[in-house]
Amino acid sequence: MSVCKGVSGNPAKGEVFLYKHVNFQGDSWKVTGNVYDFRSVSGLNDVVSSVKVGPNTKAFIFKDDRFNGNFIRLEESSQVTDLTTRNLNDAISSIIVATFESA
């Protein structure tokens, strides 16, 4: 698991970009691997409003820590400009990032 603050452009394979505001604005983080509790990352818990997922990557984003509660699955190279549309705006507390090879 790795979380780095500050991103630009689009995520690579195995990466998910999280943004504090809608439309990929504000503070941002690059996540690789699973994070079971966003409270362990300063400033990240319950603040994410938009998401980008890299190629050959899927993300499972959970409302609660330890991969519990409501969640959404995001497919490779997908983008969500406003998590309000998924009832998870400013409410994400854990994530699973999975990579796969193309067929």
Swiss-Prot record:
Protein name in the entry: Spherulin-3A
Domain Beta/gamma crystallin 'Greek key' per the UniProt entry, residue ranges: 14-55, 57-99
Subcellular location as annotated: Cytoplasm
Keyword terms, alphabetized: Cytoplasm, Repeat
SS bond list: none
Single GO cellular component term: membrane
Region (N-terminal arm): 1-13
GO biological process: cell-cell adhesion
Classification via SMART domains: XTALbg
Family listed: Belongs to the beta/gamma-crystallin family.
Cited function: Structural protein.
Pfam families per the UniProt record, alphabetical: Crystall_3 (PF08964)
